[in-house]
Amino acid sequence: VNPFAAALEDPDRLHTRASDRLKMMHDASHYALLPQAVAEPVDAAEVGRLFAVSAAHGIPMTFRSGGTSLSGQAGTDGILVDTRRHFRSIDVLDDGLRVRAGPGATVRAVNARLARHGRKLGPDPASEIACTLGARVSNTPAGLRC
């Protein structure tokens, strides 16, 4: 059994077939790195177990949400951890002064929730429909009106 599959409650969420790995080897950049596997954790506990396996086996992990990076940050030849599907929560707090969102929530979805409070995230990447908060935090994109 693949130790990364054992870190997930449902081992079917570790994708090792060539077709699954090939479709995730590109982000929006020209770089192409074929991951060893693609993991789809559903919660922080599974992410923690993936980190433990990664450290124990010396296999690097890279997180991917929207795959909109123009610089190759969403690619790896290690384990690719896809947060797009299961980490989309958005909680607007304090009348829009704060927002708590998962790394898979898109900038557009967060801004739609904040608009009800007369607020939005800035700056604004052109890829807001696909760009996620995980990328915004980890890759510091500037956007069109910076």
Language-model region placement:
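Short, structural beta-strand-to-alpha-helix junction motif
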Residues: H86, L97-R98, A105-V110, T132-L133
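A gly/ser-rich beta-alpha-beta helix-loop segment of oxidoreductase catalytic cores
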Residues: L70, R108-C146
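N-terminal flexible segment immediately upstream of the FAD-binding catalytic core
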Residues: V1-A56, G66-L97, A126
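Conserved phosphate-binding and hydrolysis motifs of nucleotide-dependent enzymes
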Residues: D43, G104, A135
